[in-house]
Design a protein with these regions (language model features):
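Structural signal for hydrophobic packing residues in well-ordered secondary-structure cores
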Residues: 1, 8, 12, 30-38, ...
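N-terminal Rossmann-like NAD(P)+-binding subdomain of aldehyde/semialdehyde dehydrogenases
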Residues: 1-53
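Conserved C-terminal structural/oligomerization subdomain of aldehyde/semialdehyde dehydrogenase
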Residues: 116, 141-142, 179, 234, ...
Length: 401
């Protein structure tokens, strides 16, 4: 936890959930999956080409996994890649992000000192240069590449892997929509979901719902409720247990956020709250929780992943337009819908082209839940049994009877 707070800027609250404590549940889950998995499947006897044959197929490890991980939730992603790979029988080379090398190296040290894995089964390679990952993506001895990061870098990983036809898992960017239907009685839950979800990782999460779609008939009411809730989660010292939102990871990331906020202003949007660095917080890369209203879905801030504590509020007329706006994105990683009618909410949720959906505040995160994206948000699934099977090959057998 101390390393995560110091390196990521994560709050104590985040470390007690998504940053450290919850990811630890990945370990026992995959132990149980491996123990109970059907490694061999009997297909029975069949007459084929004039002879009877006994057929079956078996699952075996894909081989050497190159795991390239991001800086936003490093322990979560490192474990989500290493543990299922080991459970499947693979060797792993972990390359953590330069901004969070300590977290990756600490995990490697824990594994080396507390398990009986032979040398070379788990390897951690740290480097200040992000391009160091290309040594792994280009190497023909790597059997699978598992990458979590931006869509821009994901394209480069996929291109590099094509030279050796290396299997690729990609979990990439997102611009997920939180849809609020017009029959919601109270915007309190909506506002809390939007604000506190954003605050947990200071908006630096690919699966966060950063586009808030609101019924035009209640737009002002909803915007006010969300702005009030966001004002209740100001940034603070992550070492203070009472702090709900820490700093951004780096000056580079804060500059990126500021650039997007300025682009929204330039395109005619309105800053409802936040929009600047907080006064008196010069140590650390802090930025105020920011809500931008009067946003059209074609604006840059509605189409591109900002990766900071910025939400955009987009109005819609009816359910059909809400679905259209939500799907009008190159991404498809996550999303949410709120309605006073659960069936109506589910009907909308099923029309959104995305890998995960929260209905009326439901939490989908868990070691047993497959996670991944549609469209340019990725290829394949992490977590769950599906995440285990990503690390397996299928070999079919036949013998005469």
């Amino acid at each position: 936890t101390a390393i995560t707070v110091a390196e990521v800027g994560a709050t104590q609250m985040a470390c007690s959930s998504i940053q450290v404590v919850e990811p630890l549940k990945i370990i026992p889950f995959y132990i149980d999956v491996a123990k109970g998995y059907e490694w061999s499947t009997d297909l029975g006897v069949m007459e084929t080409l004039g002879g009877e044959c006994q057929r079956w197929f078996e699952k075996e490890p894909v081989g050497v996994l190159a795991a390239i991980t991001p800086w936003n939730v490093p322990t979560q992603v490192n474990l989500a890649k290493i543990i299922p790979a080991l459970a499947a029988g693979c060797c792993v080379v972990l390359k953590p992000a330069p901004d969070t090398s300590w977290t990756g190296l600490a995990l490697g040290k824990l594994i080396a000192e507390n398990t009986d894995f032979p040398p070379g089964v788990v390897n951690v390679v740290s480097a200040a240069d992000p391009a160091a990952g290309s040594y792994l993506t280009d190497d023909h001895r790597v059997d699978m590449i598992s990458f979590t990061g931006s869509t821009v870098t994901g394209r480069k990983v996929m291109e590099a892997a094509s030279a050796n036809i290396t299997k690729v898992f990609l979990e990439l960017g997102g611009k997920s929509a939180l849809i609020v239907l017009d029959d919601v009685e109270d915007f309190g839950m909506v506002a809390a979901t939007a604000a506190f979800g954003m605050a947990t990782v200071c908006g630096q999460g690919c699966a966060l719902s950063t586009r808030i779609l609101l019924p035009r008939s209640r737009y002002g009411e909803a915007v006010d409720a969300i702005a009030a809730m966001m004002a209740a989660v100001p940034p603070g010292d992550p070492t203070d247990a009472a702090t709900m939102m820490g700093p951004l990871i780096s000056a580079r990331q804060r500059d990126r956020v500021e650039g997007y906020v300025q682009s929204a202003i330039d395109e005619g949007a309105r800053i409802v709250c936040g929009g600047s660095r907080p006064d008196g917080m010069d140590r650390g890369f802090f930025y105020e929780p920011t809500l931008i209203a009067d946003v059209d879905n074609s604006m840059t801030v509605a189409q591109e992943e900002i990766f900071g504590p910025v939400l955009v509020a987009i109005p819609f007329e009816d359910d059909d337009e809400a679905v259209m706006i939500a799907n009008d994105s190159i991404y498809g990683l996550s999303g949410a819908v709120f309605s006073g009618d659960e069936q109506r909410a589910l009907q909308v949720a099923k029309q959104i082209r995305t890998g995960t959906m929260s209905v009326n505040g439901g939490v989908w995160y868990g070691a047993d839940v497959p996670f991944g994206g549609f469209k340019q948000s990725g290829i394949g699934r992490e977590m769950g049994t599906a995440g285990f099977e990503e690390h397996l090959e299928t070999k079919s057998y036949s013998k005469p009877v």
